[in-house]
């Protein structure tokens, strides 16, 4: 999970909110909202950090609509999530579909609490937190430790490690190269994209400083 810095809401969303009886379901088209969220998040899922696009993303509500309808059109409550295997059995779902109407403890868009400070990763690709409630969010509510996601994170790190080991055959990476890689993974590329599973890679690179 990567911290999200929220920007201004799309103008058409702000205009629609003034409509009497406005609801998220009736707000259309949603293209400008999706585009705004994708740009904000560097085209990665707000929860699992896999690559997303307008065609395969969902607009997640951190505070679910059924829990607090008053925030259904609040841009600060909107996040871009992957499809999370919607329609599959619950055990195979993750991210937005898996969350359902559960209110999360952790919020990647919280301006007062950086979610990255509460999340840790094991070498095998698992995500966890020392905070019991947050760990429950990650592992159970969002199902971020389902095997395909764990494997994807692990494979991404393996690729980075292999690249560095080619540069440093003795496997003693230079501090400057590590810092360079951290900077690259912390930044959007020329297409405005963050790398998939970027925080997982950054977490382990920082441990090698």
Regions found by a protein language model. Give the residues of each.
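A boundary/linker detector
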Residues: 1-31, 200-209
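Hydrophobic scaffolds flanking metal-cofactor catalytic centers in soluble metalloenzymes
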Residues: 1-20, 36, 41-44, 62, ...
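Short Cys/His-rich Zn2+-coordinating modules
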Residues: 22-34, 59-67
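Short cysteine-rich loop/turn motifs with clustered Cys
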Residues: 32-57, 85
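Catalytic micro-motifs at enzyme active sites that drive phosphoryl/nucleotidyl and oxygen chemistry
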Residues: 34, 49, 66-71, 105-109
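Histidine-centered nuclease catalytic patch
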Residues: 50-93
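Long, low-complexity, intrinsically disordered segments enriched in glycines and aromatic residues
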Residues: 91-153
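C-terminal, charged low-complexity interaction regions
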Residues: 133-209
């Amino acid at each position: 999970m990567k911290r999200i810095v929220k920007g201004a809401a799309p103008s058409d969303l702000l205009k629609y909110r003034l409509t009497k009886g406005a609801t998220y379901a009736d707000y259309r088209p949603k293209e400008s909202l999706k585009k705004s969220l994708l740009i904000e998040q560097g085209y990665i899922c707000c929860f699992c950090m896999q690559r997303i696009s307008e065609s395969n993303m969902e607009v997640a509500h951190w505070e679910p609509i059924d829990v607090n309808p008053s925030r259904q059109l609040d841009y600060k409550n909107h996040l871009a999530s992957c499809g999370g295997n919607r329609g599959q059995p619950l055990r195979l779902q993750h991210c937005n579909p898996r969350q359902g109407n559960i209110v999360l403890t952790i919020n990647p868009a919280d301006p007062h609490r950086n979610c990255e400070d509460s999340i840790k990763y094991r070498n095998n690709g698992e995500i966890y937190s020392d905070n019991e409630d947050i760990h429950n969010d990650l592992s159970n509510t969002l199902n971020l430790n389902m095997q395909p996601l764990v494997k994807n994170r692990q494979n991404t790190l393996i690729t980075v490690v292999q690249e560095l080991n080619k540069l440093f055959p003795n496997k003693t990476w230079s501090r400057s190269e590590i810092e360079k890689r951290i900077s690259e993974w912390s930044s959007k590329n020329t297409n405005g994209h963050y790398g998939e599973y970027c925080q997982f890679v950054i977490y382990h690179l920082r441990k090698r400083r």
